[in-house]
């Protein structure tokens, strides 16, 4: 991932309602949620929700699919994982005692000897 792409993804998430929507979709899993369920989950009117879903979709963080009368939205896990990897890929490369900034799961593995 290039820095410009990361900035676009982070900009899309840098708004409270959009971040709440994205987190709800991440929690829902790959099947996603219908727009009405998202609106309920984040207590947002349909017109406002539509705007935010469009922003998240344009950034590449959310996918949509039609199923009958309903549109289901889901998080794009590949994009999310790519962003997380980008953010942490050079974590502490220049620091001594790098274990202090390693992700928690990695620290737990190191402590258990796995």
List where the protein language model places each region.
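N-terminal helix-turn-helix DNA-binding core of bacterial DNA-binding proteins
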Residues: 4-5, 9-45, 67-79
